Regions:
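Hydrophobic, aromatic-rich transmembrane alpha-helices
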Residues: 37-45, 213-214, 265-273
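Alpha-helical transmembrane segments
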Residues: 29, 33, 62-66, 87, ...
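Aromatic-rich juxtamembrane segments at the membrane interface
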Residues: 1-87
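Internal transmembrane alpha-helical bundles of multi-pass membrane proteins
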Residues: 76, 80-264
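Glycine- and aromatic-enriched alpha-helical transmembrane segments of multi-pass membrane proteins
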Residues: 131, 163, 247-301, 306-308
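Generic recognition of flexible, low-complexity loop/linker segments
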Residues: 122, 298-300, 366-367
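Extracytosolic and intramembrane catalytic regions of membrane-associated proteins
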Residues: 313-441
């Protein structure tokens, strides 16, 4: 209830991520929205039961004010993480709109919340949480504004509730899927059924019982509310365990070019918000994104900035130059490639590929002379005497310039080299004391 996840088992966290239920862990828009909804319903019902006419007249505004205060208190209790701050701003804009007799759920409210957050934290624009939150919120607002006036609604409230749950889970999943694939290189095939079986329970059981436990806490009776919370969370854990057990529950997605996500976001916004024939031009942008993502080319060679690991891309996955060590880097490379292998398998590929890339990291041959040819790339963590016409990257040079990615052309020659630390004016004007990138021809 306060965002503390230290007691969770790593296996459970992994199951939640594979089923796209990890958003239930962080205090974000879902939790804040459910809390505010519970408070709005409870306070407004209480006001309507009171015999005072003026209280009934302003029941909606009183409930909105109490819900706003509750959200502010919850923000403080949870520690005020960035995701919680973002959620608070979003619900605060909605509740203030209610206080001033404005429409609470609208695209203007979403835009205002985004503007406030970007004024407070401009760097949030590039964070996955900000992008996914506002993608889901914008999509849900557009979907429910359409649903409100559509002919698909039933006269039965129960049927509309079920359809609403399905629609919200489907729309939010579709809206956040490209951002999750871009940032986390993972697409969950079981996200929709897992969320449909879990998210409604958060609103029906977990959050109301959590609010009840807070109310009963001063009297030492919070166990009654926490019992319902435990039942709901146990159900969610079982759902995550069941769906994550499928062999094809997830797929690794290759990282596309940086322009893909901005073009996709702008194109979708134009398609669903713009009025007029011009909006159909956004389909060109969406088509280019799909083409660019499907033809994304990963680097043939990746070199760690400490010269501790080298990876060569093969059809089976990325071959790694060491049997162990630099595990986090190897995992990130595999996720970005969309072909995640364990370290032993990746090292086995290194033994079988016909390599023009050599990695000198073992101290057994420390300082020994090495001769190279023009077709080879040598990466050395140690002080080797390397002679020849090859390209050499040593530890000192990599520490200064950052990790390196290399692409080859159709003729087998290097077509592009990119590094993690682009040279600044200061770096260009300051002579390098040690390290080398040598290409003697």
């Amino acid at each position: 209830m306060t965002g503390d996840r230290s007691g969770l088992e790593p296996s459970l966290v992994k199951d939640l991520r594979r089923t796209n239920l990890a958003h239930l862990l962080a205090i974000s828009g879902l939790h804040m929205g459910l809390l505010v909804s519970v408070m709005l319903l409870a306070v407004r019902t209480l006001c309507l039961l009171l015999p005072v006419f003026i209280t009934r007249l302003y029941a909606k505004k009183i409930a909105a004010f109490v819900a706003l205060c509750t959200a502010a208190v919850y923000l403080g209790l949870s520690g005020g993480s960035i995701s919680t701050q973002r959620a608070f701003v979003m619900v605060a804009v909605m509740l203030v709109a209610v206080l001033f007799d404005r429409r609470a759920i609208s695209l203007r409210s979403v835009a205002l919340a985004a503007a406030i957050l970007l004024l407070l934290r401009p760097e949030a624009l590039f964070s996955p949480g900000f992008q996914m939150s506002f993608a889901a919120t914008t999509a849900l607002v557009v979907a429910f504004l359409w649903w409100k006036d559509s002919a698909f609604q039933s006269r039965r409230k129960a049927v509309n509730w079920v359809l609403g749950v399905f629609l919200s889970s489907f729309v939010a999943g579709i809206a956040t899927a490209p951002y999750a694939a871009y940032h986390f290189n993972l697409f969950s095939h079981v996200s929709l059924p897992a969320n449909m079986l879990s998210v409604p329970l958060m609103g029906i059981l977990v959050m109301p019982c959590a609010v009840l436990s807070f109310v009963l806490m001063p009297f030492g009776l919070e166990a009654f509310g926490l019992f319902g919370v435990r039942l709901g969370l146990e159900w969610i854990a079982k759902v995550a365990l069941y769906f994550s057990g499928f062999s094809n529950a997830t797929s690794e997605i290759v990282t596309p070019q940086p322009w893909v996500l901005p073009v996709l976001s702008l194109s979708v916004l134009v398609l669903f918000i713009w009025r007029g024939r011009f909006k159909w031009m956004s389909l060109v942008g969406i088509s280019s994104v799909l083409l660019g993502w499907s033809t994304a080319q990963r680097p043939a060679v990746l070199i760690d900035q400490d010269a501790a690991l080298v990876g060569i891309l093969t059809k089976e996955g990325r071959a790694l130059s060491k049997e162990r060590g630099a595990g986090f880097i190897a995992e990130v490379w595999g996720q970005n490639d969309g072909l995640l292998l364990n370290h032993d398998e990746a090292f086995g590929l290194w033994q079988s590929v016909n390599m023009t890339v050599k990695h000198h990291w073992s101290k057994k041959n420390h300082g020994g002379p090495v001769h190279c040819t023009a077709e080879e790339i040598h990466v050395t963590r140690l002080r080797h005497a390397i002679s020849g016409d090859c390209i050499i990257f040593d530890k000192a040079y990599l520490s200064a310039i950052g990790a390196i990615a290399i692409w080859f052309g159709e003729d087998g020659r290097i077509s592009r080299i990119a590094h993690a630390k682009p040279p600044t004016v200061k770096k260009l004007c300051t002579p390098r004391k040690s390290g080398r990138y040598k290409n003697s021809q």
